[in-house]
Amino acid sequence: MDSNRGEIESEHGPRTSELTLNGEAGKTLSNNSAEMKFSYERRKGFRGSASRRSASVSDQAVHTIVEELKKRIALPFDIKVIFAQCGSPDSFYDEDSHEIVICYELIDGYYNLFSQTLKGRTAQNEAAKGATVSIFLHEVAHALIDGWDLPITGREEDAADQFSTLLLINGMPDGDEMALAGARSFKLLAALEKGREKDYSDAHSLDEQRFFNTICLVYGHRPEQYEYLIRNGTLPPDRAFECEEDYTRLNRSWQTLLGPHLAYSSYQEKARGYGSSQEEARRNVMRTRLQ
């Protein structure tokens, strides 16, 4: 992105530490033979080369994230990822068909949203890409919660947001920037809805809340790097005070939930690196933290 990335963009490159998951010793590690399969519906009456480029960039980014995801977490079943024309900007997971649908209109909407605040097509495409990947991982969380019957507490939509952000900021390529782009999309959407009646009954938190929840986790992960979020007034000091604890607690919770579903290939790689017995290596892997 260019120098006009906005007040919540990362000032530094993402950390490259590997995401691994710990769980209970004695659990059987999952076999990651399940796949994500992609399908693309043809767009009808589509015009606009800029939106087409944005959709292509976002599609490529989703493919990259899927490859990284498969190294870390086993899928409960094959999941079909469908890029489709839906008639409105949306994304969703269908628990009956095990399909994640990303609507072209949603990607277009992200591009148009960021076009109003960012200069240059590269910056706009990168922001739309980040927001798309962020919401895609949100839908992946729904699939994992469904398939592995994860005993989450609280609202599932909030838990899905947490999973998306935590996965991105813990070693995913360009993960910090993508998480912050997702946060910024919530902020911009909230601004567009200013003056409208809020739907407090919706399963999702309000866009303003999703914005602050996301940047709180980003800040809590690396407060020294993102201290500027407090300086420029983006993150209120009273909320920032709780963010490190929030990150640690939620990070540990997702480690516990997903530990038994650590991808087997990731386990094998770690086991070879330890140069010890398989059982000892397995215990070491399961103790490894997200950090």
Task: Report each predicted region and the residues it spans.
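Auxiliary, metal-adjacent structural segments of Zn-dependent hydrolase domains
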Residues: 55-119, 125-130
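Hydrophobic or amphipathic, alpha-helical segments that drive membrane association/targeting
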Residues: 2-84, 290-291
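Alpha-helical scaffolds flanking conserved acidic
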Residues: 129-134, 156-158, 180
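Active-site/pore-lining binding-face segments in mid-to-C-terminal subdomains
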Residues: 169-221
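Pan-zinc metallopeptidase signature
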Residues: 13, 17-39, 198-291
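Acidic helix-start/capping segments at beta-turn-to-alpha-helix junctions
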Residues: 78-92, 161-162, 177-193
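Short alpha-helix carrying the canonical HExxH Zn2+-binding catalytic motif
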Residues: 125-145
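An active-site-proximal "capping" alpha-helix that borders the catalytic cofactor pocket
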Residues: 153-172
